């Protein structure tokens, strides 16, 4: 296999041997062709190189643009991935209520041994103890934290008890002050009431003394005290001591007088008045032959004249009865034998 130069170009020749072509210098035309072919080959190589370089120069901006496009695509893909993860993270943390609650709880704080700790710091302590000391360290830290919270509860309860005791003491003091004021007021009221009662007692005693010092007639005594009458035997002054009045011939006496006995003793009008009015002073008791002088009788009658005049109008009906004349007769104070001549209804029974 050999090479031939035909028209300035190299052509393979299968018929010829592989020996290098021989160039003869037999003719001048061949020499010129040979020279042209050599020059054309060198020019061809140069032109080819220049064309390749020019093509490379032309293709470089395209390659640069392609590289830029590839780089921009890679950047866009990375940004898309970042945006996706950011969006997903924002959805998980900000829009999920459970995540929001978790974040808020991590920001909370608790008192442990009277010191405030945030939960995120406590969580970091637990995680670090787990990493360093493993499970035993985690259990010890949790136990210490629990004891700290228990200590805080005890201290808070003690503070509450002290506050309650202080409030109770304050309320008791106020109640004692109120009770003392009430006692003072009650004592003042009691003293005022006692003074008023004493004044009323004094006034009542004075009125009673005035009423007791007032002299009432036998008619007034009998009407004011609603006296009932009872029969009593009386001794006659003219007859002997053994001669007594019969049961029908009796005198009217009052049951209210404690000094009157059912024996042969007559009572003076002054003693009857004093016994009915419950006075302490008493007059001497005389027997039935009690007599009064004319001056004493006049004075005694003058004492009753004024008071008897006040009851004249009210006593008009009673004056008509014989018993009234019997009881109000002045002869009753002179002798007892004249009383026996009348019964309680005014009927004349006869004389001894």
Swiss-Prot record:
Principal place of residence: membrane
Keywords noted in UniProt: Glycoprotein, Membrane, Transmembrane, Transmembrane helix
Keyword Transferase listed: no
Superkingdom classification of source: Eukaryota
One GO term describing the cellular component: membrane
Bias (Low complexity): 50-72, 193-213
Region (Disordered): 41-73, 193-219
Subcellular location: Membrane
Tagged with keyword rRNA-binding: no
Membrane topology note: Single-pass membrane protein
Residue spans crossing the bilayer: 131-151
Glycosylated position list: 14, 52, 70, 165, 186, 192-193, 203, 289
Protein name: Putative uncharacterized protein DDB_G0274369
Source organism (scientific name): Dictyostelium discoideum (Social amoeba)
């Amino acid at each position: 296999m050999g090479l031939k130069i035909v028209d300035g170009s190299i052509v393979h020749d299968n018929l010829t041997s592989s020996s290098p072509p021989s160039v003869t210098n037999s003719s001048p035309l061949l020499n010129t062709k040979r020279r042209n072919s050599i020059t054309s080959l060198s020019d061809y190589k140069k032109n080819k190189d220049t064309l390749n370089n020019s093509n490379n120069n032309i293709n470089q901006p395209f390659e640069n643009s392609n590289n830029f496009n590839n780089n921009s695509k890679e950047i866009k893909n990375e940004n898309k991935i970042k945006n996706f993860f950011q969006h997903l993270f924002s959805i998980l943390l900000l829009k999920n209520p459970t995540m929001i609650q978790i974040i808020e709880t991590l920001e909370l704080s608790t008192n442990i041994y009277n010191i405030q700790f945030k939960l995120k710091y406590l969580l970091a302590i637990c995680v670090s103890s787990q990493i360093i000391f493993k499970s035993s360290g985690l259990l010890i830290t949790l136990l210490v934290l629990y004891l700290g919270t228990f200590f805080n509860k005890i201290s808070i309860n003690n503070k509450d008890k002290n506050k309650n005791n202080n409030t109770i003491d304050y309320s008791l003091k106020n109640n004692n002050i109120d009770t003392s004021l009430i006692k003072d007021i009650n004592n003042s009221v009691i003293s005022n009431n006692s003074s008023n009662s004493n004044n009323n007692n004094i006034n009542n005693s004075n009125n009673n003394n005035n009423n007791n010092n007032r002299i009432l007639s036998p008619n007034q005594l009998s009407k004011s005290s609603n006296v009932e009458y009872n029969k009593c035997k009386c001794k006659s002054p003219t007859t002997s001591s053994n001669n007594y009045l019969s049961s029908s011939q009796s005198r009217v006496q009052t049951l209210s007088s404690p000094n009157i006995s059912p024996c042969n003793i007559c009572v003076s009008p002054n003693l009857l008045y004093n016994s009915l009015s419950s006075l302490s002073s008493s007059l001497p008791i005389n027997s039935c032959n009690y007599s009064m002088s004319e001056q004493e009788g006049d004075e005694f009658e003058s004492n009753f004249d004024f008071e008897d005049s006040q009851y004249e109008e009210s006593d008009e009906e009673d004056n008509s009865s014989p018993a009234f004349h019997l009881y109000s007769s002045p002869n009753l104070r002179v002798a007892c034998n004249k009383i026996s001549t009348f019964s309680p209804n005014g009927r004349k029974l006869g004389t001894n």
